[in-house]
Amino acid sequence: MTYTTSVQTIPELGQALAQRRKLLNLKQGQVAAQSGLSQALLSRLENGQLTEFGARKLMAVLAVLGLELTFTDVGAAGTLDELRRERGGTA
């Protein structure tokens, strides 16, 4: 199973992590405990209530969710419409 998403803000990050957690049928408390965070902190992240979230904490949550961090140039991913145009109208 491949899971790819693009995020540019901390609220988008929280939403993406929540989606992945739910996809894996994990509870916030499980992910929080395994990553060394409080459930309240993970909840605030998932609900877009944080303005900062440390790299170590992020790496711990990603590990629990079976994810890794990848960097892409802004705009390099393109859109579905751009992909369709490149492929002659089908995607």
Name each model-derived stretch.
Residues 36-51:
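Recognition helix of helix-turn-helix/homeodomain-like DNA-binding domains
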Residues 9, 41-44, 58-61:
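Residue-level recognition of specific faces of alpha-helices
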Residues 1-23:
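A short, Lys/Arg-rich alpha-helix, primarily the initiator
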